[in-house]
Amino acid sequence: MTTFQDKVKALRAHHEELLSRKNEPVEWGNGIYEKYKNLILTAEHTPLEWRYDFDEKSNPYLMQRIMMNATLNSGAIKWNGKYLLVVRVEGADRKSFFAVAESPNGVDNFRFWDEPITMPEDVVPATNIYDMRLTAHEDGYIYGVFCAERHDDDQPGDLSAATATAAIARTKDLVNWERLPDLKTKSQQRNVVLHPEFVDGKYAFYTRPQDGFIDTGSGGGIGWALVDDITHAEIKEEKIINARHYHTIQEVKNGEGPHPIKTDKGWLHLAHGVRGCASGLRYVLYMYMTSLEDPTKVIAEPGGYLLVPEGPEYIGDVMNVVFTNGWIADEDGKVFIYYASSDTRMHVATSTIDRLVDYCMNTPKDDYRTQFSVEKIKALVAKNKQTLSK
């Protein structure tokens, strides 16, 4: 007869096998990055102590008392030699919360810290919080900027009506957080990211103005704004630095991912773009670069997407989606790109700064017409004929 303790032992062994599974790159890639074979985080990776009551008297059937639904959209930072993700964990009750998962190498063996993050409330409590962007700022703090969702009380009869604001918190240890007032803006905001350096002595934000909770409406793309005081942050002026365009991967909306990586050629940016299709909205990742001297000036933008949902990545709670809000650049130039697929689970892809700069600088831009796309392909064919004939 299988005892309660036998079941617990088997459960822990199964969980440890999942956590300790080694990861390796897929065999064939595109030369820009390598995806990895195994998922790095799923709902099943969350600690058993978060889900099970291990008291046989109160839980004789060893049921999950608190179920987890997804691990997604994670901020990332290299801290004390470890690769840390501040994960958006979504429970079965649809409420998201933040929790730190730590890896020794950035690609596998991610383990959650003992408890989720206790995030202090704003003056007006949020119903849901999610999608944190982490920035180790030159002022000495680690900042987390995330979406705070509340019901839109101007529409009392609509239980799906919501508002989105950019919440700001800061920490020195990723355990104890100081909640600052939400970013004050003229419109709703998602996908707000703090630039890692002062610009003209001010804090700089990448923004995404939008008319509604989901629809960007008149919002033109990824914006840029300066703020005098981070403890009472207010955006009075913002300008679009990476716009949306008709019949492109960012036709419907776009948003900054993690904060950009500084290179000797410029700032590397990773973003998401959204277009409509017959099955709904399709989310992909793309890149662009801005000038070191003027971070609002785009100096390179490869045409098309960098990374899309492939195979099983397409399936999940929200289909046909990849999303990122975290990457880590190592001292040796290796880059870890952390992305979620279909709002369900977390993946990693790796590249290098040199490869990503090359990709941005030397991939043809989108000229917005089929004719120009064909001309670029034919030019490459002609170049290859000449090269291969030597």
Label every model-predicted segment.
Residues 1-73, 77-127, 136-193, 197-252, ...:
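Beta-rich carbohydrate-recognition and catalytic domains
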Residues 310-314, 322-327:
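Short glycine-rich, acidic/polar surface loops and turns
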Residues 328-333:
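Well-ordered alpha/beta subsegment
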Residues 336:
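Short, surface-exposed ligand- or partner-binding patches at beta-edge/loop junctions that are enriched
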